[in-house]
Amino acid sequence: MDQALRRKTLERFEQHRRAWDTDEALRTLYGRWYGLVREKLPPHELGPWLELGSGPGFAKNVIPELELSDVVGAPWLQHELDAEQLPFEDGSLGALVLFDVLHHLPHPARFLAEAVRTLRPGGRVVMCEPYVSPVSYPVYRFIHEERCDMSVDPLAEAAGTGGDPFEGNQAIPTLLLRRREEVERRFPQLRIAGFQRFAGLAYPASGGFGRRTLLPMRLWKALLAIEDRLPDAVFRLIGFRMLAVLERQ
């Protein structure tokens, strides 16, 4: 990665850290979602928990035991590394956490192979990623800055994107989970141990990074409370996010 791109990436990290400090809706959502991730982690005694693509480092606020990493180093990160070429010994990790990372990887299948190699039996990959539903698709496809291409093969050698770490295809995680049998056939040491859809309209209404919440905070919290009571079947139609757990056999 050239120096100009490294500087650009670090600037984005800093922008996101400032947004975290000033945006209550953002902290609420991401705090909840990292809480969901924590619930799915294996016992820490199994081995280190490593987050890939930690970027601004929000995870430490909810899961202080996590070791943080990214392709570009920063003072709050413990490792600078490539998720597709992990610098760890075979069977040395307890968990790999990816939060909005899988859909940015140039070669998702290479990462899955590295997960098989580095995780101990019983170790887990826990991923919080975009979910493409009938309601979220037009938002991801036509409004969001990242692309959403449902035509790609998520296990193909060139499934993802390259170059800028912030480029991505938000369809990759959904496409991968739709091909569950193929994933488990190609990587028999990985079993899909959990899958959950969540986050309805309260997510885009939060404004995300760099935008103000679209509703008064009181109304936004009311919308979030309503969504908390909705069953999974509803999020099949309106969900914007997913949590997936892959367990090393």
Describe the function of each predicted region.
Residues Q170-F195:
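Short alpha-helix
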Residues V125-A159:
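Conserved class I S-adenosyl-L-methionine
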Residues Q85-D90:
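Short conserved loop adjoining the S-adenosyl-L-methionine
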Residues V97:
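A conserved beta-strand element that flanks and buttresses the S-adenosyl-L-methionine
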Residues A109-R124:
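A short glycine-rich, Lys/Arg-flanked "PGG" loop and its adjoining helix->strand segment in the class I
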Residues F235-Q249:
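Core SAM-dependent methyltransferase catalytic element
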Residues D100-V101:
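Short catalytic micro-motifs in class I SAM-dependent methyltransferases
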Residues M1-E84, M242:
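Conserved N-terminal segment of class I S-adenosyl-L-methionine
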